[in-house]
Amino acid sequence: MMSSSDPTVLWRMSRGRSTAHATIFPGDGLTTVTWFFDGVMDRAENYDTLDLALARAEQIRGILLKDGWKETA
C-alpha cells in the first residue's frame, strides 16, 4: 500500500532513443521533484508545498513537449 509520502513518477517522455521522467518526493515541510534523463538525475528542486512542486514539474513537461518530446506509458 502506498502512503502519501511515497515517491511517485509524475510523467515519462521520450524523444528518439532518449527518455525522461519526473519523480516527486512528498515530505514534511518540503516536497522534492527530480528530473531524470536517460536514467541519470539531471536536477532536484525543493518546494514549500506540493502544489508548487507539481506546477514546476508541469512547466518542465510543457517545455519538453514543445521541444519534441512525446509522452510515454
State each model region's role.
Residues 30-33, 51-60:
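Short, surface-exposed linear segments at secondary-structure transitions and domain or protein termini
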Residues 58-71:
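Short arginine-rich
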Residues 3-5, 73:
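A charge-rich, low-complexity, intrinsically flexible signal that marks solvent-exposed coils, linkers
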Residues 45, 72-73:
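Edge beta-strands of extracellular beta-sandwich domains
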Residues 5-21:
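N-terminal acidic leader/helix
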Residues 38-52:
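A short, exposed loop/beta-hairpin motif centered on an aromatic-Gly-Thr core
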